[in-house]
């Protein structure tokens, strides 16, 4: 299953790490505005490589939006405007009210899952990823 993680910090990177640990054949790709985060995520084996948003939509069936909460609304609409019926988009931001209101009337709303892993630490970035961050969540 080809998955793109958009945002390779603590939460997105930890999700990528967990997906890579699974027995099923996940192919995890990364998107991040920070070249440092991208190169570190590749070096740590969190993602196979980086993709542009267009490449991720064309290549992957799952997209995880792990960018800062204030950027998720615009990104969610941009992604939902461009996906097909075979895609699923997850948001793992810390707030839900405005995000859910923003996507509520979108024609691809049924392909969007608003989620929160209820996990965090005081650290950030790909080096802060934690394999067991979501255990028991």
Predicted segment positions?
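A short helix->loop->beta-strand "cap" motif at the edges of active sites that frequently abuts
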Residues: 25, 83-87, 108-110
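Short, well-ordered alpha-helix to beta-strand connector turns
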Residues: 47, 60, 86, 136-137
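NAD(P)+-binding Rossmann beta1-loop-alpha1 motif at the extreme N-terminus of oxidoreductases
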Residues: 1-57
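Rossmann-fold dinucleotide-binding core
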Residues: 106-137
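Short secondary-structure boundary/capping segments
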Residues: 54-55, 81, 104, 129-132
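Rossmann-like NAD(P)-binding element
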Residues: 53-90
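Short beta->alpha hinge that forms the Motif I/post-I loop of the SAM-binding pocket
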Residues: 33-34, 67-68, 92-94
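Conserved short alpha-helix immediately C-terminal to the canonical SAM/SAH-binding motif I
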Residues: 36-37, 71, 96-99
């Amino acid at each position: 299953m080809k998955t793109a993680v958009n945002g390779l910090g603590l939460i997105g990177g930890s999700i990528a790490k967990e997906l890579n640990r699974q027995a099923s054949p996940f192919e995890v790709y990364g998107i991040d505005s920070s070249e440092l985060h991208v190169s570190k995520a590749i070096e740590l084996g969190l993602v196979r490589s980086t993709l542009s948003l267009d490449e991720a939509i064309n290549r992957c069936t799952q997209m995880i939006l792990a960018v800062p909460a204030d950027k998720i609304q615009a990104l969610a609409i941009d992604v939902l405007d461009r996906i097909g019926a075979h895609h699923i988009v997850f948001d793992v931001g810390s707030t839900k009210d405005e995000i859910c209101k923003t996507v509520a009337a979108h024609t691809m709303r049924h392909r969007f899952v608003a989620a929160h892993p209820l996990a965090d630490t005081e650290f950030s970035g790909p080096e802060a990823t934690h394999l067991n961050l979501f255990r028991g969540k």
